[in-house]
């Protein structure tokens, strides 16, 4: 077995343990607003989710969206999907489903947060097509990004389009 992989995930008992006795007491004292939890994977394809899809599944995303309420959308890291592609994805998912698109690697890895206004504008225009199904976008920096470059992150966040 490779770490983190199993031959047949259908044989795993994913039953959650009982709540700790103090959980109800602590939650009863909470005065916070309601919140939603979104759970999903980084991809929905059959190769990465071996054994997840029932035999004969014709459309992975449609089935995936019956089991999870979100997806960490890695596809946007490599290229920007067309408005038509985003519409197709949206139509295959239920109303409360969210897409959490990763910011393109052109911003994070190639330009390393320098002179990215044009790419960020294109990215923002693209992901706005998710409409109500757009979750939070996120940035994954290169593994050799250093603390000395934090000023780039500050500028990037400051300049980020407010509509996203």
Predicted regions and their residues:
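Residues lining hydrophobic/aromatic ligand-binding pockets adjacent to catalytic sites
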Residues: 1-164
